[in-house]
Amino acid sequence: MQTIYTKITDIKGNLITVEAEGARLGELAEIERVDGRSSYASVLRFDAKKVTLQVFGGTSGLSTGDRVVFLGRSMEVTYGESLIGRRLNGVGKPIDGEGECFGDPIEISTPTFNPVCRVVPRDMVRTNIPMIDVFNCLVKSQKIPIFSSSGEKHNALLMRIAAQTDADIVIIGGMGLTFVDYSFFVEESKRLGFADKSVMFIHKAVDAPVECVLIPDMALACAEKFAVDQNKNVLVLLTDMTAFADALKEIAITMDQIPANRGYPGSLYSDLALRYEKAVDIAQGGSITLISVTTMPGDDITHPVPDNTGFITEGQFDLKNNCIDPFGSLSRLKQLVIGKVTREDHGDLANALIRLYADSRKANERMSMGFKLSNWDKKLLAFAELFETRLMSLEVNIPLEEALDIGWKILAQSFHSEEVGIKEQLINKYWPKSCLHR
């Protein structure tokens, strides 16, 4: 039997305080308003006989005479095949105008996967983006952020990854989206043809902060069920984790919590880690691979959100000047697949390309300072132009093997074979035949 409480003693922002007993942290409650409408709230704090709840959708229209019913469970989301191709909001309700989703309700506040059932990742997730596939491979079950500078088209990059990945299901969690961003997600998913294998959980900038905090939990809870129950390889794309952290900060300030670095709550690290640690490769099952976008306010990588994220994740993609910067990017798991599930020349070729491109940056500095360029400097600058056009550009969309072949061609067009520092047996096998005399 459910107990109905009517003593709402305080309404502050999106929070209400109720005189009640027996509630637990994270428990869901239904608020029955005097005008007949209802809304949901989640328990954030309890003290003696007072319980503080965060109201989904805000407290506008609430009165102290409304009734609060604790439901004895945490927030749930519908899981099932009917979820594929749908778009839902921050409380799990459809927003695509196609009716209700049918399936089983699952709790979203679940612990991370049992470490005993995890396996060491050994498979590559292909994206057909050379700066990822060649130089910083995305590995199945990896958790990795995209650190985005101001003005970068990170959402367009996410949509390309979603369209070109070989994952079975793509789950997108959008937080703090403008209407333009949301429309872009919908239109691109249809144009690129992956809408029928995707699920979108969307929080718009005008929605309540608590709904923003729920988006990653809903996306990851559904991903885990698809991976465990159906052995699916799921790619989860979250944007923007800075908006997620800002929502946590807003809630913490409303609750009068003592702020930590730059006003963010002291629990920021654990709040981020709790979500990222959901990435998993399951023995005898599927997998969850997690890519998130973390925008850097003022391009400051020491900002608390990217700073904490870097300690949790397994590398990062640095999106800068409309390309993935090879020097700021890192995949800590790439050694598990390079040369093992990819071609034997992958590692040596990638290292040579990056080394020569780094040298070309120095040659470019010498040129900008007016120094006389050597023949080697001129070769490096010619190589850099080819490298940036044919491999670094985000417009390039080619499979890994073709990207490796292009890498060899770029080297052959710019250097003699003995100048690139690659093993002779690989030179003999992969150096373009028409350029063997070089």
UniProtKB/Swiss-Prot annotation:
Give the UniProt record's GO annotations in the biological process aspect. proton motive force-driven plasma membrane ATP synthesis
Keywords on record = ATP synthesis, Hydrogen ion transport, Ion transport, Transport
User: Any keyword Lipid metabolism?
Assistant: no
Checking Gene3D superfamilies in the record gives: 3.40.50.12240
Xref: InterPro entries: ATP-synt_VA_C, ATPase_F1/V1/A1_a/bsu_N, ATPase_F1/V1/A1_a/bsu_nucl-bd, P-loop_NTPase, V-ATPase_su_B/beta
Q: Which residues form a coiled coil?
A: none
From the Swiss-Prot or TrEMBL record, what is one GO molecular function term?
ATP binding
Q: Which family does it belong to?
A: Belongs to the ATPase alpha/beta chains family.
Q: What does this protein do?
A: Produces ATP from ADP in the presence of a proton gradient across the membrane. The V-type beta chain is a regulatory subunit.
Q: Record's HAMAP family?
A: ATP_synth_B_arch
Official protein name in the record: V-type ATP synthase beta chain
Give the source species: Chlamydia abortus (strain DSM 27085 / S26/3)
Q: Which gene encodes it?
A: atpB
